[in-house]
A protein has these predicted regions:
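Acidic/proline-rich low-complexity IDRs
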Residues: 1, 37-40, 117, 141
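A broad, low-specificity signal for short, low-complexity segments enriched in glycine/proline
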Residues: 1-5, 21-25, 73-74, 119
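Extreme N-terminal leader/targeting segments of oxidoreductases
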Residues: 1-18, 36-38
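Conserved N-terminal/central alpha/beta ligand/cofactor-binding core
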Residues: 8-10, 45-164
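N-terminal Rossmann-like FAD-binding beta1-loop-alpha1 element of flavoenzymes
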Residues: 18-42
Length: 164
């Protein structure tokens, strides 16, 4: 049994198909990606809307312009990683990034724009302008969009103030 702080209600563990531990960007997105027919318990150690993801000011790197390429993004990432990167993981992340950006926009994330196109910046070890932002609050914008969708899903119960 689980009793979130400030609640008299107990939550039985055996009612859940999936338990997601952590409600930062990864936990929120994982919860949203699960099929609607599954009952999901999302456990969050924080009682307020706080997470490391929310404080992230950096942007999201993605190949979205014709003068860029997956190969160049992979090369930049591996160079910056100085031998610490898992090549297969880097390849997957780089190739999936444009789809993730599209998905985030469908969910309601509004990236900075220059006229009618997504605005990109040149940062860190990137050799092309490929970093997308929401002002200097990209992490906050990301988490807020994901939280809004999690809270609207009837199959997801988001419990705050739970230590696992």
């Amino acid at each position: 049994m689980l009793r979130p702080p400030f609640s008299k209600n107990l939550i039985e563990f055996n009612n859940w198909d999936v338990i997601v531990i952590g409600a930062g960007a990864a936990g929120l997105m994982a919860s949203l990606e699960l099929p609607d027919n599954l009952n999901v318990l999302l456990l969050n150690r924080n009682t307020s809307k706080v997470s490391s993801s929310r404080w992230a000011q950096g942007g999201i790197a993605s190949v979205i312009k014709p003068d860029d390429s997956f190969e160049l993004h992979i090369e930049d990432t591996l160079k910056a990683g100085d031998g610490l990167c898992d090549i297969k993981a880097v390849e997957m992340l780089v190739r999936e990034a444009p789809n993730c950006v599209d998905n985030l926009q469908r969910l309601g994330m509004i990236f900075d724009k220059n006229l009618d196109q997504l605005s990109t910046t040149l940062e860190a070890a990137h050799s092309c302008r490929r970093v997308l932002h929401v002002k200097d609050r990209t992490g906050r914008a990301l988490v807020e969009v994901l939280e809004d969708h999690v809270e609207s899903k009837k199959n997801i119960l988001h419990c705050r103030g739970v230590r696992v």
